[in-house]
Design a protein with these regions (language model features):
Chain A
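Cytosolic-side transmembrane-helix boundaries in multi-pass membrane proteins
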Residues: 1-31, 219, 223-226, 296-335
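Helix-loop-helix hairpins and the membrane-proximal interhelical loops
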Residues: 14-56, 244, 248-253
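Transmembrane helix-bundle core of multi-pass membrane transporters
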Residues: 16, 133, 138-200, 227-230, ...
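Hydrophobic core segments of alpha-helical transmembrane domains in multi-pass membrane transport
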Residues: 24-37, 65, 90, 115-119, ...
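Single transmembrane alpha-helix segments in multi-pass membrane proteins
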Residues: 33-38, 43-97, 101, 128-135, ...
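Alpha-helical transmembrane segments within multi-pass membrane transporters and channels
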Residues: 98-145, 288-292
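Helix-loop-helix "hairpin" substructures at the membrane interface of multi-pass membrane proteins
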Residues: 107-115, 121-126, 179-254, 265
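Transmembrane alpha-helical segments in multi-pass inner-membrane proteins
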Residues: 239, 249-315
Length: 335, 335
């Protein structure tokens, strides 16, 4: 802080601009350069391909989580919406295939709609409870997490659902456009959409306003309840989309998909500087943070670090990232 | 300060109407209704054996829910509780089996198990408390980090496998020994812990301060309370209670289990919140935790007796959590 005072104004401004983006891009660049230099297999096409694809799912999920965090909420249920959408879409596709085996387009459309519908249902429960009954988002989404997991398991008995149209699995899930997995384009599209909403629409501004100060937003005439419900709906729908993309890649509907998804999505958002108090968060940073997490995981895989030790490492990184952010913010406010 | 809290409580009592009493008694009434309803289909539910069984089962959850309450009172929560339990179970079992293999006498085994278990708990509590209270980081992020760290530790040091052959003397002392005929040791410990906590929360400066810190952190700070120290101590107390519960569970299973705490984090929060501990901080007590724990245990016991499947139980628990938070909201807005 004191060292900053002696700096002339231009570098001060530079520092401010730098602080606005945070340290994440720098850390990311250093990480990538270090990995490229010291881990030989990191810069292979196959590896970059893998990192991009696995990041895509987390980016979609974290963009949704960020939206809810911005309005001062939480969504623990995303980790259950992913398998729920997976199971529901697969079951509907298998059913539709039995009714009309030749209508692949309609089968896929029905499955996708059903999957997104299941996301909408969970989002509606979360959103309505938070907006109208004003109950803690933590508990509501804890409840819907339990419910959605139970429903997904009940529908399948925990057995994977096979028999989706090959066109869906090979064409979309495992397909490539211009050498890249389709999921990457889907994620890019969603990030662009969220970025547009955040920066150029009334809804985007309102979401920040609600998270910054709910009371003030209400008094200013923002229909806060509607926007709260929309935020939760949006988050669940993105989780469902992520589930659909994963299902298409795996080739079956799974009631048990990684239990860590919720935590990872929150970790990515938090590392990106999204405030858990609401009102702060940008989708481009969240995208970078999701990349950061998965590049790190990938590097540890390449270095043959035991996945169990990786867990410890990730835990430390989440806490450290936020601690650094907090300390930097305090300095800025003293400044 | 203590007086102020009591006075405002007494003031509210005078204005209580019929509906308020119904809300306060909703949980006990619901429990009685549930047990009578189940009795109609399955008389065994009210047999002495089953009631004793329910009480014994509750004695573990009540410890974890009380641990969770200590931090929820201060507007926090502890996501790391479940994996802390797993890590402690494994660590203490490893030390005890190692010493037993080296031929150490019984009292050394038990002492070593207790020291390692409680010491590990203290470390986790200090970690959480340090970051939450001194660095002012959101408890969600901090305990999310320690969740991952403990998960990694639990699976690494055990190699992912249970640690068998925990010395019989340990199980005798904390599980199946007989000190007072008719009263199991876990239940006795649970009762003692509840009495101790009741005293701590109601008759010590530390306990009363926790309520004020949760109700109004700014007022607590201005009143000159050592808020940071007390907040840190709350996390320490939480992890120590969890550690003790972990040792008792280890004594019951007779092995160190890396997955022991799997669902405990959610269950402990659910039990506390269903009992009426408010996530807004400052509301709750030992009585609330006992009621919540009994309700959750009775519900799962009744469903087991009625042979309801595990998936449906999960869905129902989710619904119960959401309903409980609605009731809590009603109570708060009327109070």
């Amino acid at each position: 802080m004191s060292s900053l005072d002696v700096h002339p104004a231009p570098s001060h401004r530079l520092y401010r601009a730098y602080a606005r983006f945070g340290f994440l891009p720098t850390v990311l660049v250093i990480l990538v350069v270090a990995l490229a230099l010291f881990v030989p297999r990191f810069l292979t096409v196959q590896n970059i391909f893998n990192v991009l694809r696995s990041s895509a799912y987390l980016v979609i999920l974290s963009a949704g989580q960020m939206t809810v965090l911005i309005v001062g909420g939480f969504d623990l249920s995303v980790g259950a919406v992913v398998p729920l959408a997976s199971v529901v879409s697969a079951l509907v596709m298998v059913w539709a295939k039995g009714v009309a085996p030749d209508q692949t387009a309609i089968i896929v459309l029905l499955g996708v709609l059903a999957g997104i519908g299941s996301g909408l249902a969970v989002g509606l429960i979360n959103g309505l409870s938070v907006a109208f009954l004003k109950v803690s988002p933590f508990i509501v989404t804890l409840g819907s997490l339990s419910i959605a997991t139970g429903v997904a398991l009940l529908l399948t008995n925990g057995i994977p659902v096979y028999g989706m149209p090959q066109a869906y699995v090979n064409g979309f899930g495992r397909g490539l456009w211009l050498q890249l997995p389709t999921a990457v384009y889907l994620a890019a599209l969603i990030v662009a959409l969220v970025w547009f909403i955040q920066n150029f629409t009334r809804m985007g501004r309102y979401l920040y306003a609600i998270g910054g100060n709910l009371q003030a937003a209400t008094v200013s005439g923002v229909r806060t309840r509607t926007y709260l419900v929309l935020a939760y709906l949006f988050c669940s729908v993105l989780a469902a989309v992520s589930g659909l993309a994963l299902t298409a890649q795996i080739g079956s509907g799974q009631a048990v998909i990684s239990a860590q998804l919720t935590l990872e999505s929150i970790a990515a958002a938090v590392i990106a500087g999204v405030s858990l108090k609401g009102g702060v968060g940008r989708v481009e940073m969240v995208t970078l943070a999701a990349f950061f997490l998965l590049i790190l995981t990938d590097a540890m895989d390449l270095l043959k670090i035991d996945p169990r030790i990786q867990t410890i490492f990730l835990g430390c990184i989440v806490v450290l990232a936020v601690a650094l952010d907090e300390v930097a913010k305090r300095r800025a406010s003293v400044d | 300060m203590t007086d102020a809290i009591f006075v405002s409580k007494a003031g509210a009592d005078r204005r209580r109407g019929l509906l308020d009493w119904l809300l306060i008694l909703s949980l006990p009434l619901l429990m009685i209704a549930m047990e009578l309803g189940v009795y109609a289909f399955e008389p065994r539910v009210l047999s002495l054996r089953n009631i004793v069984n329910v009480l014994n089962q509750s004695s573990y959850l009540v410890l974890f829910a009380s641990a969770q309450m200590m931090v929820i009172l201060t507007r926090g929560f502890d996501l790391s509780l479940g994996t802390t339990v797993s890590a402690i179970s494994v660590a203490s079992a490893l030390v005890m089996t190692g010493l037993a293999a080296a031929g150490a006498p019984d009292f050394v085994l038990v002492a070593a198990g207790l020291i390692v278990g409680l010491g590990f708990g203290a470390l986790v509590g200090l970690f959480n408390g340090f970051f939450v209270s001194w660095l002012g980081i959101n408890p969600f992020v901090v305990t999310l980090g320690s969740l991952n760290i403990c998960l990694g530790l639990a699976t690494t040091i055990s190699g992912g496998r249970p640690v068998f052959n925990v010395p019989d003397v340990f199980s005798l002392l904390f599980y199946n020994g007989v000190l007072i005929p008719g009263l199991s040791i876990p239940l006795m410990i649970a009762i003692l812990v509840c009495l101790g906590l009741y005293f701590l929360l109601n008759h010590t400066v530390f306990g009363r301060s926790l309520y004020l810190i949760g109700n109004n952190p700014r007022a607590a700070y201005l009143a000159g309370l050592p808020s940071k120290r007390f907040l840190g101590l709350a996390y320490l107390a939480c992890s120590l209670l969890a550690a003790f519960g972990a040792l008792m569970l280890t004594a019951r299973t007779g092995s160190g289990e890396p997955n022991l705490g799997g669902s405990l984090m959610l269950e402990s929060i659910a039990a506390a919140v269903i009992g009426g501990v408010s996530l807004q901080g400052g509301v709750g007590g030992v009585g609330a935790v006992i009621m919540g724990t009994l309700f959750v245990t009775m519900l799962s016991n009744s469903m087991d007796l009625l042979e309801v499947g595990g998936y449906i139980q999960q869905i129902l628990l989710g619904c119960v959590i959401i309903v409980a938070i609605f009731l809590d909201r009603l109570r708060l807005t009327r109070g």
